[in-house]
Structure formats: C-alpha cells, structure tokens
C-alpha cells in the first residue's frame, strides 16, 4: 500500500483546516494529521525579550513526534488509520485499497526539511493582512492574544517564516484564501485526483 502525501499550509486563519477537512471528506481512504496537535506544553514554549510566548516557530512544536506519526502511517497505513487517526470516517476506509491519501495541515509544515522531503503536492493559502488580523481577532485562543500581539509578533513571524519557506522549496501552489471555499476545494481536489491517477498508473 502506497501513501500520497498532500501538504496544506498557510498563514494563521487562512482556511487551512477548512480546506483540509473538506478534502478529507471528498477523498476516500484519506486521513489528516494536523500540526497544531503537536504544540509543546505551554511551560516550555520559547519566550521573547518582552515575555511573549513564541508559538509561531518550529521550536514551539514537537516536530520529531509529528514525523514519527507520519512515518508510522507511511510504513503501515492500515494499522495507523485504525488505531490513531481520529478524523478518519469509518465509511471512507477500504482495507484493500492500494493508495492512502495523507493530508498534512499546518502553518509551518513547509519550514521543516524532513517533512518537506515527503510531500507529493504542496498548497499554501494566503489572505491579506487586514483580513488575517480581523479573523484572528474574532477567534478565541488559549491563552488569549495579549494586546498588540498580532502586529508585534504574529504578522512579523509570518513574513519571516514565509521568506524562509520560499528559500527552502519552490514547487508550492499558492491559493487565494478569499476565493469561495467551493472553488478552492474543487481546484485542489481535481489536482490531487490527477496525482492519484498518476501514482496508480505507476503501481500497475
């Protein structure tokens, strides 16, 4: 059994989870691994000179654990999907399928070289500064964002991480996060289906 690995990255509140979940619902034998599930305990998250927690950096995440889970799925997809993949719908799993689609979703998935090396397709959702700031302000975080956190930390770190990402990898498909959700889903779904067909042809 082979695994097709699809990366869905992007800025905070850009629509990554929505697209990933919709894609998962449309693709049989698919599973999602979300980077947000691998944040370190708040007590060990790095702190800057102003005492603000630095969540928007690789060091705030258990990337070794994330890679371990991804590699376990790639080695034995059936066992992993049955035991650990919480978002798998039972009706979408066919035991005898030849290809499993793993959707890896997160804001820094393209900034970690070991993970970058295994993606078959890469997508990055982007939205304008003002939309991102507004969406961020409407969401409840634990702990909550302190005053000035978006402009003083979140946005500057996004720009830094994006520059780093673009220096590491070139074959990313950038998506306009303001497009209707249905259009974004249709575009990515078509692309992934074509990649699936190419993989199945190679397996014959």
Language-model-detected regions and their locations in the chain:
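NTP-dependent small-molecule kinase module
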Residues: 2-3, 97-99, 138-141, 156-204
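Short hydrophobic/aromatic beta-strand immediately N-terminal to the Walker A/P-loop
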Residues: 6-7
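P-loop (Walker A) phosphate-binding loop of NTP-binding proteins
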Residues: 11
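Conserved lysine of the Walker
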Residues: 16
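Hydrophobic positions on the alpha1 helix immediately C-terminal to the Walker A/P-loop
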Residues: 19
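Post-Walker A helix-loop "phosphate-sensing" segment adjacent to the P-loop in P-loop NTPases
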Residues: 25-33
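Conserved nucleotide-sensing/catalytic segment adjacent to the nucleotide-binding pocket
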Residues: 31, 40-89, 101
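A glycine- and Lys/Arg-enriched "phosphate-lid" helix/loop adjacent to the NTP-binding pocket
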Residues: 50-53, 113-164
């Amino acid at each position: 059994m082979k695994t097709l690995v699809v990366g869905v990255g992007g800025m905070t509140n850009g629509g990554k989870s929505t697209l990933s979940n919709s894609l998962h619902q449309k693709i049989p034998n698919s599973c999602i691994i979300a980077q947000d599930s691998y944040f370190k305990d708040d007590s060990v998250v790095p702190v800057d000179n102003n005492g603000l927690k630095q969540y928007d950096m690789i060091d705030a995440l258990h990337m070794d654990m994330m890679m371990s889970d991804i590699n376990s799925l790639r080695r034995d997809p059936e066992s992993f999907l049955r035991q650990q993949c919480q978002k798998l719908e039972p009706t979408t799993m066919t035991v005898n399928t030849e290809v499993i689609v793993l959707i890896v979703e997160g804001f820094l998935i393209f900034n970690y070289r070991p993970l970058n090396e295994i993606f078959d397709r890469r997508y990055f959702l982007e939205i304008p500064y003002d939309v991102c700031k507004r969406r961020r302000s409407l969401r409840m975080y634990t702990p909550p964002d302190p005053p000035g956190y978006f402009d003083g930390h979140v946005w500057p770190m996004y720009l830094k991480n994006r520059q780093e990402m673009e220096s590491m990898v070139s074959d990313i498909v950038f998506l306009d996060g303001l497009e209707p959700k249905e259009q974004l889903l249709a575009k990515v779904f078509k692309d992934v289906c074509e990649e699936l067909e190419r993989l199945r042809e190679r397996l014959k």
